[in-house]
Design a protein with these regions (language model features):
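Residue-level signal for well-ordered alpha-helical positions
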Residues: 5, 41, 71, 126-129
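Short, conserved clusters of charged catalytic residues that mark active-site
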Residues: 9, 63, 77, 134-135
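Small-residue-enriched segments and motifs
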Residues: 12, 66, 80, 137-140
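ABC transporter nucleotide-binding domain
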Residues: 55-89
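Non-catalytic connector elements of ABC transporters
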Residues: 75, 85-167
Length: 167
């Protein structure tokens, strides 16, 4: 196996070669980071069916369902029920208590059961500005990773809520 820096360097080199020769390349991998780095389009399969075919940024930022959201990248998830949909937002009453305002990705109606996904890099500890979702949690663990720290919180009944905080 290649070390991390060499592996990333080789991924960029292979991507540039693909772009320069101008041919279609099908690359099969289970490494989501590698797929996001090297691809212009990605297909996510589940049980032999394509769940989403998109550009890397659209796949990561706008997954069409919870399977894709949980498959690509890291997520904190909360189960709940939609209590309101309006103005391009939905309110979800969480099964563990509390409420989250979110984008209605694949929900259609009030009363519908759903999952809310939040990427670790999207949450902020002690935000200064007013935000739709502001909740108290308890820091359980901080792990230093060089360019960021992983912070594990107990938040809204989720004891494994992860934040990525830049150093």
């Amino acid at each position: 196996a290649l070390d991390k820096n060499l592996r990333e360097s080789m991924q960029y080199e292979i991507k540039h070669i693909h772009e320069s020769i101008g041919v279609t390349v099908v690359y099969v991998t289970h490494d989501q980071s590698e797929a996001l780095t090297m691809s212009s389009r990605i297909a996510v399969f589940n049980d032999g069916k394509v769940q989403q075919l998109s550009t890397p940024d659209k796949l990561y930022e706008e997954p069409v369902n919870s399977f894709v959201a949980e498959f690509i990248g890291e997520n904190n998830t909360f189960a709940g029920e939609v209590t309101d949909i309006s103005g391009g937002k939905c309110k979800v009453k969480l099964d563990t208590g509390g409420e989250i305002i979110s984008n209605p990705i694949s929900v259609k109606s009030k009363g519908e059961k759903t999952k809310v996904s939040l990427r670790p890099e999207r949450a902020i500890i002690d935000p200064e500005e007013k935000m739709d979702n502001k909740h108290k949690g308890k820091i359980e663990e901080i792990i230093y990773h060089g360019d960021h720290a992983r912070v594990r919180l107990n938040l809204l009944g989720n004891k494994e809520f992860i934040l990525k905080v830049p150093n």
